[in-house]
Amino acid sequence: MKDLLKFLKAQTKTEEFDSIKIGLASPDMIRSWSFGEVKKPETINYRTFKPERDGLFCARIFGPVKDYECLCGKYKRLKHRGVICEKCGVEVTQTKVRRERMGHIELASPTAHIWFLKSLPSRIGLLLDMTLRDIERVLYFESYVVIEPGMTNLERSQMLSEENYLDALEEWGDEFDAKMGAEAILALLRAIDLEGEVKTMREELDQTNSETKRKKTTKRLKLMEAFLQSGNKPEWMIMTVLPVLPPDLRPLVPLDGGRFATSDLNDLYRRVINRNNRLKRLLDLAAPDIIVRNEKRMLQESVDALLDNGRRGRAITGSNKRPLKSLADMIKGKQGRFRQNLLGKRVDYSGRSVITVGPTLRLHQCGLPKKMALELFKPFIYGKLESRGLATTIKAAKKMVEREEAVVWDILDEVIREHPVLLNRAPTLHRLGIQAFEPTLIEGKAIQLHPLVCAAYNADFDGDQMAVHVPLTLEAQLEARALMMSTNNILSPASGEPIIVPSQDVVLGLYYMTRARINAKGEGMVLAGPKEAEKVYRAGLADLHARVKVRITEYLRQADDSLVERTELKNTTVGRAILSLILPKGMEYALIDEPKVLTAAEQADLDANPQNWIKSVSNKALGKKLISRLLNTCYRKQGLKDTVIFADQLMYTGFHYAALSGASVGIDDMVIPDAKKDIIAAAEAEVAEIQDQFLSGLVTAGERYNKVIDIWASANERVSKAMMENLSKERDVNSLGEEEEQASFNSIFMMADSGARGSAAQIRQLAGMRGLMAKPDGSIIETPIVANFREGLNVLQYFISTHGARKGLADTALKTANSGYLTRRLVDVAQDMVITEDDCGTVEGLWMTPLIEGGDVVEPLRERVLGRVVADDVIKPGTEDEILVARNTLLDEQLCDLLERNSVDRVKVRSAITCETDFGNCAHCYGRDLARGHLVNKGEAVGVIAAQSIGEPGTQLTMRTFHIGGAASRAAAESSIQVKNTGSIKLQNAKFVHNSDDKLVITSRSTELTIMDDMGRTKESHKLPYGSVLEVKDGQAVSAGDTVANWDPHTHPIITEVAGRLQFEHMIDGVTITRQTDELTGLSSIVVLDVNERPSAGKEMRPTVKLVDQNGKDVMIPGTDVAAQYFLPGKAIVNLEDGANVGVGDAVARIPQESSGTKDITGGLPRVADLFEARQPKEPAILAEISGTISFGKETKGKRRLVITPTDGGDVYEEMIPKWRNLNVFEGEKVEKGEVLADGPESAHDILRLRGISPVANYIANEVQDVYRLQGVKINDKHIEVIVRQMLRKCEILSAGDTDLIEGEQVEVARVKIANRKLVAEGKTPATFRHILMGITKASLSTESFISAASFQETTRVLTEAAVGGKRDELRGLKENVIVGRLIPAGTGFAYHHARINQRAAAARAVGVPQVTADEAQQNLADLLNASGSFDEE
């Protein structure tokens, strides 16, 4: 018996495998899978419910319907296993073979497989070099195709219509062979000589020069080579045998009432079998050709429908007019096999319930209702009951649990102790959406959740539900405890900031207890310590906010981690002293009570009057930001354990004092400022005045609208300012009898000020005025809502308000779907990005500098390099070789402080993009694991983490495109630069000339003006437009507030670089120019006509201004032999006359800039999606393809010809540019490769091609960050870099070298690199390539793994391509492994896979292990069965 069980166990053992290969099935292979031919369309007998013989459910072919029982009932039970019944022919075995055994149908005529025919590009068409239309005409019997031309003048695969065929027959008889239908295509495919074709095509490729021909040949060549390498034969794309799916995978279930529920596949198979049998009969009867042909066509159509219904023609529908679900539909889409059953499954041992607050829980606990726990832990309880001897059998244990006996609860307590459970809240947008807790049993039916983890789950208690899962195995429990416990997930993986941060009530409570109040009860007391402070407060002798002196003992952490005690008397408040009781040892008191920085005058006053110490108490209370910083500091200094305890204590304390504070919202808290009436009246008067101006025609409608909106916007600002001043400050007399100002104790103000709830904007709507509202299309309604919510709205105001509210709801719904889809694409592209090695040894990296926009540092260097590994030694500024930080060092907080102290302003750090690991990434290039704070571990799935970090805040982003108009566009037209910092000027990429006033005039496009401080750090940077006049010199010192540059924002000047006399060319009045006189000033100016406006005589002319000297000779531009001449584009205005003298740096002409109207700026989610999809912008910036000198060639109707002549004498580059594009360059100007020639949004593809990998990475990272920064979301750059690395996975082959690659084909970079290393080692020529940027969808679909790609999108296309190419899936990524049902090669699975591979390698080395041959195994099995057949088992 034991042997038998052993044998049964052995049966289920799976094979070890490393990769999965997909290919075409040959007819013989299909027959070898099959257990018999299905000959009849019958399914089951409607009376006996037994399957019909030879039918679709036949037991003889597919196996018995009942376990170990043949159909007629002659053989039953295990002892007859393997016997084949002589009456009904059914093998006695388990029913589950009906899920595995396949059948087949012998087709009477071959049929084409629709996937290889219709899936674009058509594989059959590509191989035969015929168009899809022609092939379809042959297949569906509309025309003949020549198969063997013989000695005739026909050609192989030539199409012949019916008449042509008959004519040819008359002329040549049976000299030639032509057929129609799939037989014809089959014969053509059989006739292909793959090797010969490949050879001729490679020769063709070497000879041809035409691009289209190359492309076509390359495609065909790749397909042919794929066939050759994979061992597939082209004729297998035409089927002569059709496999039949095992019946249990297409079940037929009898419903009550004698009807059946059936899978659509059965209908489709029945159709095929019926037509096939009819065709066989017709062929036997030798029916007329036309009937046979029709039947063959119908057979082809029914096979098409079975494989992929609806791919060709109309889909076959069932009885209910719904298209039938074919085999292809079974695997694709959200409901298909991949996404429904393989990537996500429902699991056992889980339950869900509503959540409520558990304010008394510790951070690692959750409250689990007893009822749920009993159900979830049932098997454990049964086991315990049995092992204790309290129940004899499982049945008895079950009864006890059902009766809920007292002993059961005790056992449940034991079972649950230290057994973590997982809590999950949908939608799980990032990994913190599932965390582990230790359950504590509670009464009631709701799960209790710790308030601090709500932020990570994005949960609230308005009816949210959560699911509980029980990790069963020891390993699972271990992982839950070590990796997923809520106490181990204090930092957010997206930004490395704490995510366990108190919010709402807790913040309010802590804020309230750390506030100081003037003249509170007990002001001026001196207390012995925090304990006494608490006693005094509890006894009611002092108020929580009283300013007192307290003796505080701090423990300061030294460099060697030892603690030093320091006690001193501090000026503080009672509340802060009480709060210091929960500070972990090693954190200084200043973290919760920052000492006030006194001015010199205040210090002198304090020295003179010591009793004034009350005023030196800091008036800063703990807000949300400070609390977050407090926790962060605690984590970095004290470590995990202290932080967890501290966070819990903060929460309890916060709740306690929030309750005591009694902060509430009353209508009287919304104080309306007295100034509101006057401000509104003044605004209304201004609006009336503008209306009068409009009616008298002084301003246009547009100007009136914009001005009105400006007026109301500023009125709103003034009202809200008055309101906030009113709310936020109050004056009071202190114990010394002096009046002092303090922050208000108004409840509404406190809630907003602490960061607990609400914001200034919301208070403004309550107590100020609601302000301007937008229409649904985004334009602003010019009459604002002057009322606020306290005063109440009238009907019209209420109606206007509904627009915004409704649009908000609609947006949210859209946003959620779009954001989810973006996350899905990101996960899919990055899923195989895992840390696979410790160090790849590269010296490459990205240069990091602080991000500066205008005068503001948006992101300091410290935040950008923290947690990165240095790629190059950081040299101390001002020295030649003093190394601050050596390369390959991880920059932690201390080292970043060091860099800041030494004012380093650029660091080269390693990055995922420059990592040289072939598959995955190395730990050093990634840097710190943000959620843990140390160097990332091997096996960390950084790709998925990156995708989640970018996708999770997606729902917070807006969906809208911003219309910049009205109030906002004022800022756009800047005309000067005022510096905000004191320092020295530095110009970068500047070209300039000195004008007559000896000021610098900028003559280059990409000039940046930066302000450096005395340490050489960049403080701010500004872009200078062409033609701006500088008030300062390079290197000059400036102080904050100085204006350093001016320009005219509305026109674009053309600046002279030399002095001379003007000479006009081709400037003929009425032909190329016209004169206009200004009505106000009476001055006349010359305006150049646009090409379209000129008479035909002037079309070819190019109006030019030349500079000549006194003798009329051309003046040269200094340093070149190019004459100084300036071509004038259309619409240019010239204010000087012919022959006028000009100096250096003067403007000879001005080009009016169209005020760029209300441009739509794509913002929010769509912008992020565009960047990651690497979409080409509508009108991208035009970049210089090579470095050289600009000139303009012959113009065509709507375009200008731009010519760049390289300085080093290479080939000239020409490009046609539409006339309406505003060019930034003039004739004779020198440009560098990649410089912007015409403004517009830059295309990432151009940046990569012309500037390289590093700039494109920076561009995408900065653009994505801009969107998130606007919403206040912090994401580390690393995550974006990981995604960009995946977008740069592919390259285009420029020259193949000695590899077997084809020029112009797109291949994974890793594959080329591996091949090249091999070639270089052998001394051969490696291939050269250039990187290409792919959007995330395209990158996901073109990954090496076909399983991963097929489960993402376009399943049919991916699988078709993979099958034809005979692709192997190496199962490297996470998705593939989930689908084949293995541990993923990341995290703990990384180690498992390594161990597996090593074990196998060791087994392979230990040769000489006796291997059992198949025959021996069979013999052993037979012996076993005979042995076990001797006894019968009940």
Swiss-Prot record:
Mg(2+) binds at residues 460, 462, 464. Disulfide bonds: none annotated. Keywords: DNA-directed RNA polymerase, Magnesium, Metal-binding, Nucleotidyltransferase, Transcription, Transferase, Zinc. Zn(2+) 1 binds at residues 70, 72, 85, 88. Zn(2+) 2 binds at residues 840, 915, 922, 925. GO terms for molecular function: DNA binding; DNA-directed RNA polymerase activity; magnesium ion binding; zinc ion binding. Its cofactor is Mg(2+); Zn(2+). It is an enzyme of class 2 (transferase). It comes from the Bacteria. One of its GO terms (cellular component) is DNA-directed RNA polymerase complex. It catalyses: RNA(n) + a ribonucleoside 5'-triphosphate = RNA(n+1) + diphosphate. Binds 1 Mg(2+) ion per subunit. Binds 2 Zn(2+) ions per subunit. Its EC number is 2.7.7.6. InterPro entries: DNA-dir_RpoC_beta_prime, DNA-dir_RpoC_beta_prime_bact, RNA_pol_asu, RNA_pol_N, RNA_pol_Rpb1_1, RNA_pol_Rpb1_3, RNA_pol_Rpb1_3_sf, RNA_pol_Rpb1_4. The keyword DNA repair does not apply. SUPFAM superfamilies: beta and beta-prime subunits of DNA dependent RNA-polymerase. The keyword Signal does not apply. One of its GO terms (biological process) is DNA-templated transcription. The RNAP catalytic core consists of 2 alpha, 1 beta, 1 beta' and 1 omega subunit. When a sigma factor is associated with the core the holoenzyme is formed, which can initiate transcription. Belongs to the RNA polymerase beta' chain family. PANTHER family: DNA-DIRECTED RNA POLYMERASE, DNA-DIRECTED RNA POLYMERASE SUBUNIT BETA. DNA-dependent RNA polymerase catalyzes the transcription of DNA into RNA using the four ribonucleoside triphosphates as substrates. This is DNA-directed RNA polymerase subunit beta'. The lineage of its organism: Bacteria, Pseudomonadati, Pseudomonadota, Gammaproteobacteria, Aeromonadales. The gene is rpoC.
